[in-house]
Amino acid sequence: SSDLENILQNSDFDAKIKDEAKKLVEKILENKFSKYNSFSHKNIKLHTKENQKIILIPAQVEDDASMIYGGLGFDTLKLLQTVRQNNQDAFIIYKTHPDVVSGNRKGLKDKNIILKYCDIVLEDISIDSAISLCDEVHTITSTAGFDALLRNKKVFTYGMPFYAGWGLTNDFNKCTRRTKVLDL
């Protein structure tokens, strides 16, 4: 377990800390901050069916430590396949990872493969804008899942990111060490 996991599992947060956290979240949302702030915020019109569920899958780089240690057998392609199989009528958005777009990291970028499982690929858009389009975010370990939680979206995890297992997310895998129920 990590230091963060131990803090979350074993600490009681008083009203003052919770109030400070709430103010910080408000600032994050007000300024549309996320881990990657290099992409512009855009309003995109999706061509979906009426009442069609919209799912965002934020891509991840396969050699990232969170994927290696927390991916639990999932890679981006397996995630795409699993989400499509379990949500056949959904409109699925694939958000290419910023480090893959910039060419700095390796990741799934073959659109012919990606578009077998999703309806649209977004690249040059902020994660905040992408999250605003969806009803749910499905991820392995991406911090975009945490961004989505802050924005009151349903989040489904398939690996074990730091924010999974606390009652905030719908988890494909369970972490028996995480027994405390947290809130934002």
Spans of model-derived segments:
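Catalytic-core helical/loop segments in enzymes performing group transfer/polymerization on anionic/lipid-linked
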Residues: 2-184
